[in-house]
Curated annotation (Swiss-Prot):
Entry-linked InterPro entries: SmpB, SsrA-bd_prot, SsrA-bd_prot_CS
GO annotation, biological process: trans-translation
A Gene Ontology molecular function term of the record: RNA binding
GO cellular component, one term: cytosol
Subcellular location field: Cytoplasm
Keywords noted in UniProt: Cytoplasm, RNA-binding
Protein name: SsrA-binding protein
Annotated SUPFAM superfamilies: Small protein B (SmpB)
Organism, as annotated: Aquifex aeolicus (strain VF5)
Family: Belongs to the SmpB family.
Length: 157
């Protein structure tokens, strides 16, 4: 990875890993207004709460991604929750559309980051976890943590 491929994270959807099984990920460009880019550069607030991707008329759109309004903008400020177009290859859009038609699949944003001075979104094809799956996962994590704690001081090399 060269110096020009530097990736600088902006925000991450931490809730997604807990609520969904991630099957495939895609990197997409995003169409933003000037005030949105300035807000992101100033470390403006970004929230993935209830955000999702929908495919309409062969185009991918990101809904409910909150980007805080730019403080120094005038009347030309953006709507913080507007839908934003995602830039993907046509075959990627068609593949995602085909998968989403199957029951239980959805497309969610995972991460927002800078790459080569452009804002990118990492989106994922995901399947929602059932409540009992999440509970089982939490129990397994707790047991693993307990075992590590128990053996921490006992193993000497």
């Amino acid at each position: 990875m060269g110096k020009s491929d530097k990736i600088i994270p902006i925000a991450e959807n931490k809730e997604a890993k807990a609520k969904y099984d991630i099957l495939e990920t895609y990197e997409a460009g995003i169409v933003l207004k000037g005030s949105e880019v300035k807000s992101l550069r100033e470390k403006g607030t970004v929230s993935f709460k209830d955000s999702f991707v929908r495919i309409e008329n062969g185009e991918a759109w990101l809904y409910n991604l909150y980007i805080a309004p730019y403080k120094h903008a005038t009347i030309e400020n953006h709507d913080p929750l507007r839908k934003r177009k995602l830039l993907l290859h046509k075959r990627e859009i068609m593949r995602l559309y085909g998968k989403v038609q199957e029951k239980g699949y959805t497309i969610i944003p995972l991460k927002l980051y800078w790459k080569n001075n452009k804002v990118k979104v990492l989106i994922a094809l995901a399947k929602g976890k059932k409540l009992y799956d999440r509970r089982r996962e939490l129990k397994e994590k707790a047991m693993k943590r307990e075992l590590e704690r128990e053996f921490k001081g006992k193993i000497h090399l």
